[in-house]
Design a protein with these regions (language model features):
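Short beta-strand-to-coil "C-cap" segments at the C-terminal boundary of structured domains/repeats
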Residues: 145-151
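Short coil/turn motifs at secondary-structure junctions
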Residues: 69-71, 90, 123, 149
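Conserved active-site alpha-helix within GNAT-family acetyltransferase domains
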Residues: 98, 110, 122-140, 146
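A short beta-loop-alpha structural element at the N-terminal edge
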Residues: 3-16
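Residue-level recognition of the GNAT/N-acetyltransferase active site
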Residues: 9, 88, 121
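Conserved acetyl-CoA-binding loop-helix of GNAT-fold acetyltransferases
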Residues: 87, 93-106, 133
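Conserved GNAT acetyl-CoA-binding A-motif
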Residues: 101, 108-120
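Acetyl-CoA-dependent GNAT
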Residues: 10, 18-77, 83, 101-102
Length: 151
C-alpha cells in the first residue's frame, strides 16, 4: 500500500468530515455549510494548527490535528497537542495510524516542541498500546478534561 502523509488541502473538507463520522458516531449534528466553511478557513489560516492526512490513491484514510502552542516556560519552547486521531476502519491495523502519528511528531520536533500531548477517549487495550508504541507514555502526567455543564 503506497500511502502519502501530507497536510490537508482546502478542497478536502468533505472527505475529512466523512472520515470524522468514524471518530465519534454519536457526535452532535454539524452546523450549516457556511458556518462549516468559516471554521474550515479559520483552521487552515492558523499556522499553529496542522491537519495531517494519510492519502491512499486520492482517498483520505486517516487524519490527525497537531496544534503547536507558543510557550514562555521550558526555555520558551512550544508544546504540541494532538487531537482528532482517526483511521478509517477499513485501514486499521495496517500501520497507517502509526505513520501518521510519526509524521505529526516529527513535525512537532522540527518546530522545537519540548513535548507533545494527546488525550484518548478510547480506553481499550489496543488503543492504549497503539499510542504507547507510537512513543507516548501514559504515566508521566495526569490528564483532566472539563466540559460545559450543558453537555
Amino acid at each position: 500500500m503506497d500511502i502519502s502523509i501530507r497536510s490537508i488541502q482546502q478542497d478536502e473538507l468533505s472527505a475529512l468530515l466523512d472520515l470524522y463520522k468514524h471518530l465519534n458516531p454519536t457526535d452532535a449534528p454539524l452546523p450549516d455549510t457556511s458556518t462549516l466553511e468559516k471554521i474550515w478557513n479559520e483552521i487552515l489560516s492558523d499556522r499553529k494548527i496542522n491537519c495531517f492526512v494519510a492519502d491512499w490513491e486520492g482517498n483520505l484514510i486517516a487524519s490527525c490535528i497537531l496544534v503547536i502552542v507558543p510557550n514562555l516556560t521550558r526555555g520558551a519552547r512550544p508544546y504540541g497537542l494532538i487531537e482528532n486521531v482517526i483511521t478509517h476502519p477499513d485501514y486499521r491495523r495496517q500501520g497507517v495510524g502509526k505513520c501518521l502519528i510519526h509524521h505529526a511528531l516529527q513535525f512537532a520536533w522540527g518546530h522545537n516542541c519540548y513535548k507533545v500531548m494527546l488525550l484518548s477517549g478510547r480506553q481499550t487495550k489496543e488503543v492504549l498500546q497503539f499510542y504507547e508504541k507510537a512513543g507516548f507514555k501514559k504515566d508521566i502526567k495526569t490528564g483532566f478534561v472539563a466540559t460545559p455543564i450543558s453537555d
